[in-house]
A protein has these predicted regions:
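N-terminal hydrophobic or amphipathic helices and topogenic motifs
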Residues: 1-53, 59-62, 215-249
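Periplasmic-binding protein-like
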Residues: 1-9, 81-90, 172-210, 225-243
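Bilobed "Venus flytrap"/periplasmic-binding protein-like clamshell domains
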Residues: 3-29, 85-146, 162
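Short helix-initiation/N-cap motifs at beta->coil->alpha
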Residues: 36-47, 132-147, 184-185
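Acidic, polar ligand-binding/catalytic clefts
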Residues: 47-101
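A ligand-binding cleft/hinge motif common to bilobed small-molecule-binding domains
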Residues: 58-70, 148-174
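Short hydrophobic/aromatic-enriched beta-strand-loop microsegments
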Residues: 74-79, 131-136, 157, 176-180
Length: 249
């Protein structure tokens, strides 16, 4: 039986090859066929979940929390020292130089990443801005958010920190970083569908030992996962879910 492994649509295209290399190594470690899928957007990701096509998923913390609570997905591993932070930015030649310069009625470029938006809204509370005060403009990718800011299609833009720092130096020089979150408790998780519960320990061993060889270390570094994965403890999961609920309130 082939196992279906879905990757959240949160990563730049240059990571695609790296995920396929990781999947090849995973198949060797667990001695089972694994079919890798890269969701192109949040809607496609949800469709695969709704169709019950997902056995393993690398999900953002907000989706992971929902999958654990509502569909009984099992936590497998989390990346070590790799947190989900976000950045609010403006165009370098914009008059917006700090959060205090953001005013009601301004437009904001963002992707479908709900986690990025939710963290941004919490940061904007500091300057008395809430969701209804802004005009939200959907962008297909973080690169598109950057282009939109440079082309004056929006006043501010939202990025995953990892995506922002992967932009070219020239692109970043044309942007102004207003604020970067420092939560340090949010991270993507690898989850397992409960119907595959018998695979849990095998998967945990495979992911947590992937960095133990030079080849494994190299492929993880190519994905920005320099310190590899570690098995999730029960208290880690409980803390993450509590934090998600706090951010949503």
């Amino acid at each position: 039986m082939t196992i279906n492994f879905l990757i959240a649509p949160d990563f730049p295209p240059e990571y695609y090859a790296g995920w396929h290399f990781l999947n090849t190594r995973l198949q060797r470690l667990i001695d089972a066929p694994v079919h890798l899928s890269m969701a192109s957007n949040a809607e496609e990701e949800q469709q695969e979940i709704d169709k019950d096509n997902v056995d393993i998923i690398y999900a953002n913390p907000f989706n992971a929390s929902k999958l654990i609570r509502e569909l009984d997905y099992l936590p497998v591993v989390k990346p070590v020292n790799c947190f989900d932070e976000m950045i609010i930015a403006s165009s370098a030649d914009s008059e917006i130089k700090s959060l205090a310069d953001i005013k009601p009625g301004m437009s904001i470029l963002c992707t479908e990443n709900y986690d990025v938006k939710l963290i941004a809204l919490r940061l904007l509370e500091a300057v008395d801005i809430d969701e209804k005060d802004l005009t939200w403009i959907k962008s297909e990718s973080f690169a598109a958010v950057a282009r939109g800011l440079i082309q004056k299609q929006g006043n501010i833009g939202l990025f995953m920190s990892s995506a922002y720092h992967k932009l070219t130096a020239i692109t970043r020089s044309r942007l102004n970083l207003l604020i970067e979150s420092k939560i340090n408790d949010l991270y993507h998780l690898i989850l397992l569908h409960p119907r595959n519960a018998e695979m849990l320990e095998n998967l945990q061993n495979a992911f947590s030992t992937m960095r133990d060889t030079p080849a494994g270390e190299m492929l993880l570094e190519d994905l920005g996962l320099n310190d590899g994965f570690e098995v999730l403890k029960k208290e880690d999961v409980e803390l993450l879910i509590d934090l998600i609920e706090t951010l949503r309130d």
